[in-house]
Structure formats: structure tokens, C-alpha cells
Amino acid sequence: MKITILGSGTSTGVPEIGCGCEVCTSTDPRDFRLRSSALIEKGDNRLLIDCGPDFRIQMLKRPFRKIDAVLLTHKHYDHTGGLDDLRPFCRKGDIPIYANEDTVKHVKSVLPYCFSDVKYPGIPNLMLHKIDGNFQAGGFDIQPIRVFHGRLPILGYRIEAFAYITDMSFIEPEELDKIKGIDTLVINALRFSKPHGSHQTVLEAYNVINEIKPRVVYFTHMMHHIGLHAKIEKILPDNMHLAYDGLEFYV
């Protein structure tokens, strides 16, 4: 199973508009971060996790092939703002979208023309599905993982020995048990140490990682305050890394 990190940035992306810090002015391409998203491929099957406002740019860099399903972690714009750009992929067939009830309602409210009885030509053909327990989508067996983004319940996902969690500030013990011992974990870390009300930091993520004990960890959903990619890589434990846009790995 191949995983591609399409975007590794937080809601503002990196560089942040108007900022002249060393990260935002870095010439290292790993310090350039589009909004967070991941593409999972196994054989001919392709699964997208989140579809933010940078989706079009992200997919112009990839081979144009069918997307079998989309998993949404939650309703915020940086994770759903690119759904309309699924239009070209709908030429290859309708695209099922899986999300929790709150996100399903949000998508219907912001893209009403996709779900009206009378549709004009060219709109994306999206099929919304409310997640209720484990399910299959796009040829993958998927286990939803409930986490909290501040007070907002959102979803992470386990797919085989891989788990993807973003925007998390807290996870309940029974949900943590579902991903203990996995091979590869992608998890959010907004910045290195300064606490935030609805996103965990690298230091806070260490506690979760020590419970899960994955073989390898990639941090995602990072802001410019994370620090320079090259510098932070040197101080992380050997099995932990900052993800970067375009990173590919296999599970």
C-alpha cells in the first residue's frame, strides 16, 4: 500500500501570507506546505483522505486516474474546500464521500448544487455516506477513529497497518486501543512545544505515540512555527519524522 502526503500544512499553509520568518522564506522545498491531505493507493484502487482548497494544485502533480472514494476527517474548510475540484475525476464515475454526520450536513449546505434534484452539466457527482462503524470503500477496509479537535468530535482512520489522524487535541482510551501496535502513523503536530487549544504539539504527540508504539511516525498539519524541516529532523527520535508535501512511503 502506497501513501503519498499531498499536503502537510495547517489551515494557513506554509509560507504564511505576510510572514518573513526563516521558515516562510526558506528555499528548502520541504518547508513549503499545502493544506493537509493524503492519497492511498493499492493496486488500481485510490483513496483520498481530505480534499482541501489546495487539492487542484496537489493533483496536477499526480497521474490522472480514478479516485475510488474520499474520506473526510471533519468539516473545516482546509479539509473540504476542494470538493468541487473533484469534477474531472467524476468523468470516470461517481465518487463516494465518507464522513461523520456533522460533516455530511456541512457538505450538503456548502455544495447544495451537487445534491439537488435538478443538476446542471459538469457538476461533481458526489455520493455522501454517513460513517457508522467499520466500512469498506474504494477496495479498502476502513476503521474510523474518533478523536477531538478541541470540543469538536472528528475522525481519523485506520487502514490495515496504517493510521491517519489530523487536527487532534485529545483521544479517548478506547479509541487509542484501536490503533495500538500499528506499523505506520501519520499524526498532527501544529508546532513543537507551545500549547494550542485545539491542536496537539510535537511534545504532546509524544505521549500518544508512546501509547500506540508504531514502527514509524510522520507528523503532519504543521504551521510555520514548527521550525525548519532540516533542523527539526535532527532532533526527533529515530522513528519520527516531519512529513513533507510529496512524501511517498509504503506500508
Which residues does each predicted region cover?
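Active-site neighborhood of divalent metal-dependent phosphoester bond hydrolases
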Residues: 91-93, 103-128
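Binuclear metal-ion centers of metallo-dependent hydrolases, dominated by the metallo-beta-lactamase
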Residues: 172-251
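Short glycine-/acidic-enriched loop or helix-start segments at secondary-structure transitions
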Residues: 15, 58-60, 81-83, 108-109, ...
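Active-site neighborhood of phospho(di)ester-bond hydrolases with catalytic His/Asp-centered motifs
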Residues: 48-52, 68-76, 98-100, 163-168, ...
